[in-house]
């Protein structure tokens, strides 16, 4: 067993190898503070045929014992990955995936297992570093050393790996990954910070990354691992290179620079098929061998197309859909499309379209959070759906994909900044984004549609939030930043850079970079160009709806809340919940009680019944005085009068002489009657007189 220790950022780091998981191709036991993860790497001996991508899977396995907890539910064991586990898997996958050889076709599986959790030392960020180290000491071809850090910003100071308490007060919460040469991934949120503050956070992160990479280098130099050979191509490589001669650049340019996404794809495929057939005929490639050339020829065609697109952007500043580098696609916005929903919007930017829907619910509908670290509830939820018809494809409909969960999480972090506090707006808010069309930047379209729909629903947001996806083309030191990228520019570009925020600052940030050498100045330019675009998009949102609607939808529940003495919470609940259940049934409402603060929340579809329930409960805790007026319920009828309950357990007599001209027998149990308190004797017994309707 080998062991390496170092103190970094005020906490001890430990890497171990050779003690556990020795049958894996690569394994690292990593400890940071009291957080411990095991990163393992394994690779298949067989090549996967017929694919044009690296078959990599990354799994983040959360174990509840790591936090000293037993899983909830009937089955007391871990099941399929949780949403937080999926997000952590993506966080590890994104910085390591670009470092595999493009022609690796053996299945690679990276598993990061969480064994111990320290709330002040994030296991997902530790997982990035542990996975990098496990890959580098394995036989899997892997070109680079990456590390991850978390950055906070408290009281004007940037903090590397802030504590949980510091994160509560932090204006920035981002995870940054990279090599010693460059930042390659960013994911996080902020509380309306400036572009300069975000840039300095990135620079602080990179300096910290260099230290962790240097520690990894100390470990890796002690291993002399022979990397597995990459598969030899079965086709004639020289013949594939010759295929380039069949591509007419003028014809190719016409097809790449077609205006519409589908038109562009159809024209490009049509041209490709025509030259491939000629290539096969001219080079006498028999039909049974043509299948072997299908993927390499298409890759070569895409490579030439990519180079041409990039060259024209660099030299002419012209993009595939005819825009300049800073141009934003045409934007249209609508609100109030769906009559029965609580709020709705349609945001369209070019060929990307998001239908945003808001649903308001009672506090009882809060989402329960039970992760390794976090326990509690969540009152703002955003879900992102990406159906296959949005790209004109046919695919089976299953549960949400990892991509959908990741995009929804980013949009939720962006919009969360404008959600009013619970004491101002006690509703549970669910936003759903249905992507109806997609050609790049659908997560940022989701941010925009969500902001519009929230105002349409009457949620008292103080401002709009918008997002934009930026790109980068970097050739021989010359870089062009692209605003509002389409799918092709995302696929063939060097960077996908998403920024969301209000007019006052950035609220969410995500970046994936495929190249090194992105300078601080280029990042600054990208941030400020994104700000310019964001302001333009925000103006479009404000033109559509400038402030929240004054009234909620008639179909939204009505909510009222107030406080009672928390020491008397038991009186509202009653024995076995009898009292609160009877009130719920009586008024057809939902009631939630926080017995620690005494906060009572009443919700229901009928506003009048909600108000009646509120008054009923408030009366329960109000001292009864002579002259008070109540609406009560008849509980007993006698010859000498009727007994009326004005609140649970508070029953008094209306003597026949106090009923006016009505006899007691005119009433029946359950009738409602308005009464006035006319006497309270020494024993606390109540006497009422009937009030005329």
Swiss-Prot record:
A single BP term in Gene Ontology: mRNA catabolic process
Protein residues bound to Mg(2+): 490, 496
Subcellular location per the Swiss-Prot or TrEMBL entry: Cytoplasm
Keyword Metal-binding: yes
E.C. numbers: 2.7.7.8
Sequence ranges assigned to domain KH in this UniProt record: 557-617
UniProt-listed Pfam families: KH_1, PNPase, RNase_PH, RNase_PH_C, S1
Superkingdom of origin organism: Bacteria
InterPro entries noted in UniProt: ExoRNase_PH_dom1 (IPR001247), ExoRNase_PH_dom2 (IPR015847), ExoRNase_PH_dom2_sf (IPR036345), KH_dom (IPR004087), KH_dom_type_1 (IPR004088), KH_dom_type_1_sf (IPR036612), NA-bd_OB-fold (IPR012340), PNPase (IPR012162)
Cofactors (names): Mg(2+)
Keyword 4Fe-4S: no
Domain S1 motif span(s) in chain numbering: 627-691
Keywords: Cytoplasm, Magnesium, Metal-binding, Nucleotidyltransferase, RNA-binding, Transferase
Catalysis: reaction(s): RNA(n+1) + phosphate = RNA(n) + a ribonucleoside 5'-diphosphate
GO CC annotation: cytosol
Residue ranges the record marks as coiled coil: none
GO molecular function, one term: polyribonucleotide nucleotidyltransferase activity
NCBIfam families: polynuc_phos (TIGR03591), PRK11824.1 (NF008805)
Similarity remark: Belongs to the polyribonucleotide nucleotidyltransferase family.
The protein's role, per its UniProt record: Involved in mRNA degradation. Catalyzes the phosphorolysis of single-stranded polyribonucleotides processively in the 3'- to 5'-direction.
Annotated protein name in UniProt: Polyribonucleotide nucleotidyltransferase
Lineage: Bacteria, Thermotogati, Thermotogota, Thermotogae, Thermotogales
């Amino acid at each position: 067993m080998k062991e390496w220790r170092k103190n970094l950022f005020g906490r001890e780091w430990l890497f171990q190898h050779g003690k556990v998981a020795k049958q894996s191709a690569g394994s690292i036991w990593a400890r940071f503070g009291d957080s411990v993860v095991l990163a393992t790497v394994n690779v298949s001996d067989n090549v996967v045929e017929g694919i044009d991508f690296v078959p990599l899977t990354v799994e983040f396995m959360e174990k509840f014992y790591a936090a000293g907890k037993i899983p909830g539910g009937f089955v007391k064991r871990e099941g399929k990955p949780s949403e937080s586990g999926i997000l952590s898997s993506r966080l590890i996958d994104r910085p390591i995936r670009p470092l595999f050889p493009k022609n690796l076709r053996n299945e690679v599986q990276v598993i990061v297992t969480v064994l111990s959790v320290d709330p002040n030392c994030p296991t997902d960020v530790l997982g990035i570093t542990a996975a990098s180290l496990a890959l580098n000491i394995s036989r899997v071809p892997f070109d680079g050393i990456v590390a991850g850090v978390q950055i906070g910003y408290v009281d004007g100071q940037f903090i590397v790996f802030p504590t949980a308490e510091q994160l509560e007060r932090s204006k920035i919460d981002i995870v940054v990954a990279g090599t010693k040469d460059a930042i390659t991934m960013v994911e996080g949120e902020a509380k309306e910070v400036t572009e300069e503050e975000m840039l300095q956070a990135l620079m602080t992160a990179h300096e910290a990354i260099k230290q962790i990479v240097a520690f990894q280098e100390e470990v890796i130099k002690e291993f002399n691992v022979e990397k597995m050979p990459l598969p030899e191509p079965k086709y004639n490589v020289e013949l594939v290179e010759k295929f380039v001669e069949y591509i007419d650049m003028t014809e190719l340019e016409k097809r790449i620079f077609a205006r519409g996404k589908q038109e562009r794809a159809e024209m490009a495929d049509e041209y490709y098929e025509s030259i491939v057939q000629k290539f096969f005929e001219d080079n006498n490639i028999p039909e049974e061998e043509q299948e072997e050339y299908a993927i390499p020829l298409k890759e070569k065609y895409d490579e030439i197309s990519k180079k041409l697109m990039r060259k024209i952007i660099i030299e002419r500043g012209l993009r595939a859909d005819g825009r300049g580098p800073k141009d934003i696609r045409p934007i249209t916005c609508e609100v109030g499309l769906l009559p029965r929903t609580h709020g709705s919007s349609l945001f369209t930017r070019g060929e990307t379209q998001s239908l945003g829907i808001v649903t308001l619910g009672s506090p009882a509908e809060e989402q329960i959070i039970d992760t390794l670290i976090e326990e509690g509830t969540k009152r703002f939820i955003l879900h992102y759906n990406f159906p296959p018809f949005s790209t004109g494809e046919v695919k089976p409909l299953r549960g949400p994909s990892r991509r959908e969960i990741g995009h929804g999480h980013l949009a939720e972090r962006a919009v969360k900044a404008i959600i009013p506090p619970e004491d101002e707006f006690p509703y549970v808010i669910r936003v759903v984004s249905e992507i109806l069309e997609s050609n790049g930047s659908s997560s940022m379209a989701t941010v925009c549609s969500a902001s519009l729909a929230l105002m349409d629903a009457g949620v008292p947001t103080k401002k709009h939030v918008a997002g934009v996806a930026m790109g980068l083309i970097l050739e021989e030191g010359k870089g062009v930043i692209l605003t509002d990228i389409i799918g092709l520019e995302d696929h063939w570009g060097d960077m996908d850079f998403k920024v969301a925020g209000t007019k006052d600052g950035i609220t969410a940030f995500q970046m994936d970079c495929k190249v090194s050498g992105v300078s601080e100045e280029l990042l600054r330019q990208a941030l400020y160009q994104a700000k310019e675009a964001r302001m333009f998009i925000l103006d479009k949102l404000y033109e559509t709806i400038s402030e929240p609607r004054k009234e909620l939808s008639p179909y939204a529940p009505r909510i009222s809340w107030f406080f009672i003495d928390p020491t008397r919470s038991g009186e509202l609940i009653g024995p076995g919940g009898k009292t609160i259940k009877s009130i719920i049934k009586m008024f057809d409402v939902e009631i939630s009680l926080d017995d620690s603060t005494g906060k009572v929340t009443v919700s229901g579809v009928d506003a009048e019944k909600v108000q009646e329930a509120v008054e009923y409960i408030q009366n329960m805790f109000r001292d009864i005085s002579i002259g008070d007026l109540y609406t009560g319920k008849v509980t007993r009828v006698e010859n000498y009068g009727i007994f009326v309950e004005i609140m649970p357990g508070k029953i008094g007599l209306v003597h026949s002489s106090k009923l006016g001209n009505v006899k007691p027998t005119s009433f029946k149990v359950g009738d409602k009657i308005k009464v006035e308190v006319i006497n309270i004797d020494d024993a606390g017994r109540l006497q009422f007189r009937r009030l005329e309707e």
